[in-house]
């Protein structure tokens, strides 16, 4: 018989009703003081770690006993998690802190099947829990020698302002290309296997200089807040079979890395470009979000690129630090990542079992951590059509923070498979007790694994997503689909309206639609002649800092000119020009400028010359 030692850290539970108090979460008008009692079951003689893998707290809410069960979120960080900040002279400082024994938990309330919890146990209990359909927040009261905490409903937090808070995304990623509901599609076994596979988003959070100064240069305070927010984000995506793992936190402690502006669209483009040219070269990741103190124009508090997960330029979001309540920030960040994963804004008919769902266009004063049925359908549809590969990349066994454990459904060092506990495992290819393949099995999971055997060579495992993609085939030697292949640069696309360039099909029309909306069109040639003038914003390229006007044959490779086609208004030659980032609004490299020609370094050149190299083709 195993002897256990019950360790009780606080024996008393004294409820107390308060009228008003100021906490980190804001001004609270009605709260209850509780003294949580922690009960930990340990084998006799066992050493108690600083933060146990599982904990249990008891306290009362509205006079009724509550038992809070917590489990450490072992998937919050990757082993190679890093933190980057900058010295006053701009020197990059990157550290790799030990994060295994962290203090961030998910949980539930005993005897409440609909309950959830996201809690930081670093210094008392801080976070939120859902009890009997109501969202409660809990904050430690900073009293000397006291275990007192305040518990209060979210609705009792004094609202910071009454202005609406909205997402800046306006375009449905399939506005012009409707398809059937994902549930109605006839899926191939490979598509179904892809849908069923666990997904992992390797996530980077970047804080601008304003965030650093807002928290009075206190790096520890900033980190704690971000960890609490991402812990909640992680919990929100679990029902979608996604793990959000924080792999890097970057803090611009010296200065902003580009000029910040209140125009969300411009800041989004600037952050996108900085990530592609700087951050990705230093830290491989799937998705990044910028948190800023900038008050975006209008009601906008966030913006992201639709259906862009894994895209080296577009898998980003920008977030305004609009609330002191971590739950509100987590919902906003999850909302923008939802856009990256193909989710549109909810319509009136969308439901999630709460008053508002994550993908509502306006942030509700009663936020929910649930994605609607529409969001889940959008996500499935996006996965089926786009199949973003990076989110299939499970963290390497050596990258997982916790020690290898057979039965946790994570493939770790020394394991051939891991289908969960023997009770829950339903995979006939995997021995749940040993995490080894069953006799005769070649594989247990993967899009090229069928009934425990490698799929026949030549079987399609990844459909072509568009004209510049190529279908990928199983090799017959692996359960995984080979590396994604793409059409060579210069391959015709979009009905010969463009040429493939670095996996995309850039056209003048699509660039006009991006900047000016779905009614926009390419302007007349007479507008583009403005690029022949030598002024501040019309030119073809820069040489040694000098702006070079376009030659007559190159005018469609300089500044982009569009017609907005606004109802009741005369079309004028419209351009986008931002002094803080002059590249915004220029025609993209690889864009078709004439039949058989593309833009290359501000010149309109023959497509075969632009992409020719010793191997036949190269990038511009």
UniProtKB/Swiss-Prot annotation:
Disulfide bonds join 310-390, 350-374, 352-357, 406-435, 417-430, 419-425, 429-452, 443-449, 448-474, 461-481, 468-500, 493-505, 512-562, 527-573, 540-550, 557-599, 593-604. Ca(2+) 1 binds at residues 202, 286, 390, 393. It comes from the Eukaryota. The active site is at 336. Residues 1-20 form the signal peptide. Residues 21-189 form a propeptide. Glycans are attached at residues 259, 265, 373, 396, 502, 536. Keywords: Blood coagulation cascade activating toxin, Calcium, Cell adhesion impairing toxin, Disulfide bond, Glycoprotein, Hemostasis impairing toxin, Hydrolase, Metal-binding, Metalloprotease, Platelet aggregation inhibiting toxin, Protease, Prothrombin activator, Secreted, Signal, Toxin, Zinc, Zymogen. The keyword Metal-binding applies. It is found in: Secreted. Residues 403-489 form the Disintegrin domain. One of its GO terms (molecular function) is metal ion binding. Binds 1 zinc ion per subunit. Ca(2+) 2 binds at residues 405, 408, 410, 412, 415, 418. GO terms for biological process: proteolysis. Its EC number is 3.4.24.-. The keyword Glycoprotein applies. It holds the Pfam family Pep_M12B_propep. A motif (D/ECD-tripeptide) lies at residues 467-469. Its cofactor is Zn(2+). InterPro entries: ADAM_Cys-rich, Disintegrin_CS, Disintegrin_dom, Disintegrin_dom_sf, MetalloPept_cat_dom_sf, Peptidase_M12B, Peptidase_M12B_N, Reprolysin_adamalysin. Residues 199-395 form the Peptidase M12B domain. Monomer. This is Zinc metalloproteinase-disintegrin-like ACLD.
């Amino acid at each position: 018989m195993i002897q256990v030692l019950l360790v009780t850290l606080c024996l008393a539970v004294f409820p107390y009703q308060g009228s008003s108090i100021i906490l980190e979460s804001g001004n609270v008008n009605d709260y209850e003081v509780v003294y949580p009692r922690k009960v930990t079951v340990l084998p006799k003689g066992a050493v108690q770690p600083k933060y146990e893998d599982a904990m249990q707290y008891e306290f009362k809410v509205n006079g009724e006993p509550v038992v809070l069960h917590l489990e450490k979120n072992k998937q919050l960080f990757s082993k190679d998690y890093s933190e980057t900040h900058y010295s006053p002279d701009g020197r990059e400082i990157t550290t790799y802190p030990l994060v295994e024994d962290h203090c961030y938990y998910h949980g539930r309330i005993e005897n409440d099947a609909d309950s959830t919890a996201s809690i930081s146990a670093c210094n008392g209990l801080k976070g939120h829990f859902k009890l009997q359909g109501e969202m409660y927040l809990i904050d430690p009261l900073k009293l000397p020698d006291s275990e007192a905490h305040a518990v209060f409903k979210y609705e009792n937090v004094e609202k910071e302002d009454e202005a609406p808070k909205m997402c800046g995304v306006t375009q449905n990623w399939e506005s012009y290309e409707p398809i059937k509901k994902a549930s109605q599609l006839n899926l191939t076994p490979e598509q179904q296997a892809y849908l069923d596979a666990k997904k992992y988003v390797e996530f980077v959070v970047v804080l601008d200089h304003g965030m650093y100064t807002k928290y009075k240069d206190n790096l520890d305070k900033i980190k704690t807040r971000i960890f609490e927010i991402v812990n909640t984000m992680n919990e929100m995506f679990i029902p979608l079979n996604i793990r959000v793992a924080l792999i890097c936190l970057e803090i611009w402690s010296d200065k902003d890395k580009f000029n910040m502006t209140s125009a969300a669209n411009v800041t989004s483009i600037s952050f996108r470009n900085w990530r592609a040219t700087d951050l990705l070269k230093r830290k491989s990741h799937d998705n990044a979000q910028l948190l800023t103190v900038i008050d975006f124009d209008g009601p906008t508090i966030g913006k992201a690129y639709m259906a862009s997960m894994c895209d080296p330029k577009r898998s980003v979001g920008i977030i305004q630090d609009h609330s002191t309540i971590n739950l509100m920030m987590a919902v906003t960040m999850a909302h923008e990542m939802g856009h990256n994963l193909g989710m549109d804004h909810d319509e009136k008919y969308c439901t999630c079992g709460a008053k508002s769902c994550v993908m509502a266009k306006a942030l509700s004063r009663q936020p929910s951590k649930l994605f609607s049925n529409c969001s889940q359908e959008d996500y499935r549809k996006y996965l089926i059509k786009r199949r973003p590969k990076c989110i299939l990349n499970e963290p390497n066994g050596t990258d997982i923070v916790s020690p290898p454990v057979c039965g946790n459904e994570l493939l770790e060092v020394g394991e051939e498979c891991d289908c969960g506990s023997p009770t829950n495992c339903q995979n006939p290819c995997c021995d749940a007790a040993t995490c080894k393949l069953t006799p005769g099995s070649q594989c247990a999971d993967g899009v090229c694994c069928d009934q425990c055997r490698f799929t026949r060579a030549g079987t399609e495992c990844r459909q072509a997503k568009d004209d510049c993609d190529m279908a990928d085939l199983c090799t017959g030697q692996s359960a995984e689909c080979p590396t994604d292949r793409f059409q060579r640069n210069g391959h015709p696309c979009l009905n010969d309206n463009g040429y493939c360039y670095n996996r995309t099909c850039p056209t003048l029309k699509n660039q006009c639609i991006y900047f000016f909306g779905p009614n926009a069109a390419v302007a007349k040639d007479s507008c583009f002649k403005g690029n022949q003038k030598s002024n501040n914003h019309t030119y073809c390229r820069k040489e040694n800092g000098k702006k070079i006007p376009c030659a007559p044959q190159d005018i469609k490779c300089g500044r982009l000119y569009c017609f907005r086609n606004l109802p009741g208004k005369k079309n004028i030659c419209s351009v986008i020009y931002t002094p803080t980032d002059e590249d915004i609004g220029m025609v993209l490299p690889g864009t078709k400028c004439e039949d058989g020609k593309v833009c290359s370094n501000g010149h309109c050149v023959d497509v075969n010359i632009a992409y020719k190299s010793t191997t036949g083709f190269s990038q511009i």
